[in-house]
Amino acid sequence: MAFTNVCLWTLLAFMLTWTVFYVTNRGKKATQLADAVVEEREDGATDVIIVGAGVGGSALAYALAKDGRRVHVIERDLREPERIMGEFMQPGGRLMLSKLGLEDCLEGIDAQKATGMTVYKDGKEAVASFPVDNNNFPFDPSARSFHNGRFVQRLRQKASSLPNVRLEEGTVKSLIEEKGVIKGVTYKNSAGEETTALAPLTVVCDGCYSNLRRSLNDNNAEVLSYQVGFISKNCQLEEPEKLKLIMSKPSFTMLYQISSTDVRCVFEVLPNNIPSISNGEMATFVKNTIAPQVPLKLRKIFLKGIDEGEHIKAMPTKKMTATLSEKKGVILLGDAFNMRHPAIASGMMVLLSDILILRRLLQPLSNLGNAQKISQVIKSFYDIRKPMSATVNTLGNAFSQVLVASTDEAKEAMRQGCYDYLSSGGFRTSGMMALLGGMNPRPISLIYHLCAITLSSIGHLLSPFPSPLRIWHSLRLFGLAMKMLVPHLKAEGVSQMLFPVNAAAYSKSYMAATAL
């Protein structure tokens, strides 16, 4: 019995000694870590690493640097990019840009003013303009179209002009991770040397082809179609302030002025039948299939780029629901985080909105090294962004589906109903254009207009009298509309889509006239 007591007391003494040692040692480590953070601040260490210096990376670098953060931006290629997307800034995007102090980046690049669009279908045309009497939108209700590369270079120049921004050309190979926390990146610099960069916060903003996303979550992008584009040079559209949307086959065609002398021509092809660009099949397809559907007054300009041998580029259109990473110390942004069909040209607008939100949430934090607080910021960011992102994601993906031509009577009725709705004028046109332009980021308003288009299309389908076949097609049309909407209700969240309180809070914080 005595031996047993001795063993128990010995074990208890050992446990107490170990506990005291553990707590003391842990306290020392915490103190050392805090001292290291202070030392890093004193030594001019980086606060934030941004992977990618496109629109998002450059804008975020500028915003965070203006708040006193020391930012290291690593971009694979600092030459002026050539893209066929990211060339149209909606009114809502311009508002976000101005709130970030970057509106002047649209100056000096020959950007063109756009006040709406002209829609063409089956020989008819209708003008749909951004509403000028929207009292809830505190900014000039016009868009801008431009060469994407020129805009990106202006953003890079503006960001790198700040002394606490380091813009470096390099290829990021991987993220540095310790116990579920991202500490920085490993990258190859312009000299070909592999090196590391460390910071308490890493932002991955490297676009739709992100090679870092798969190490943060298992989110995969779905390819929807391909957008094919080229430039017709030394010409100007009739009414250049209106984007031209042609409801052609197999899908839509667009023309818009991206400089005083250049017109972007772009059309969509479905993924199961893409003509080859390299062997000339695509140019033949443009001349024989797409061009005859372009209105005569636009056709000469449309064909000019092909006839002059301008380079044709094709880009996949993708969609991907936003998903948070479980790893700490890292944030995904832009197309690396969330994608939708680019039919409504609103990707940059969502991205700039995200940057505004993230900047505001980070401003109260004096030290970004607290991974727990950063995780809370990211969760809040994910919820706050929903009114804008859910509206744009749902509208972009739904609108692109409606624009695809079909021999199916129900689908074609929906397509015709969309054209009729946009061309009807009044609150229908102004309401839809406010949504398209990011002037009214309210999911419930979008649902209202989608339901109105559906009911209008059903009414058109049932006239002049509801035969059994027409009733059947109407039911199918309603089913198609639900297939467009329900997946987004699930993906974005029913409460975020249906309850207006979140949208009201977003509008008050991020759509007001006052700067952030």
Curated annotation (Swiss-Prot):
Q: Which reaction does it catalyse?
A: squalene + reduced [NADPH--hemoprotein reductase] + O2 = (S)-2,3-epoxysqualene + oxidized [NADPH--hemoprotein reductase] + H2O + H(+)
Q: Which domain of life is it from?
A: Eukaryota
The cross-references to Gene3D superfamilies, in alphabetical order and at most eight, read: FAD/NAD(P)-binding domain
Q: In which pathway does it act?
A: Terpene metabolism; lanosterol biosynthesis; lanosterol from farnesyl diphosphate: step 2/3
| Tissue specificity field | Expressed in seedlings, leaves, stems and inflorescences. Detected in siliques.
Task: Give the primary localization class.
Answer: membrane
Q: Name the keywords, alphabetized.
A: FAD, Flavoprotein, Membrane, Oxidoreductase, Transmembrane, Transmembrane helix
Q: Topology with regard to the membrane?
A: Multi-pass membrane protein
The UniProt transmembrane annotation reads: 3-23, 45-65, 446-466
Cofactor(s) needed: FAD
Kindly state one GO CC term assigned in the UniProt record. Answer: membrane
Q: What is its EC number?
A: 1.14.14.17
This protein's record includes keyword Membrane: yes
GO molecular function per UniProt: flavin adenine dinucleotide binding; squalene monooxygenase activity
User: Where located?
Assistant: Membrane
Annotated binding of FAD, by residue: 55-56, 75-76, 83, 88, 156, 172, 335, 348
The Gene Ontology biological process terms listed for this entry are:
sterol biosynthetic process
Question: What biological function has been recorded for the protein in this entry?
Answer: Catalyzes the stereospecific oxidation of squalene to (S)-2,3-epoxysqualene, and is considered to be a rate-limiting enzyme in steroid biosynthesis.
The UniProt similarity line reads: Belongs to the squalene monooxygenase family.
Note in the entry: SEQ4 or SEQ5 are unable to complement seq1 mutants.
Specify the protein name. Squalene epoxidase 5
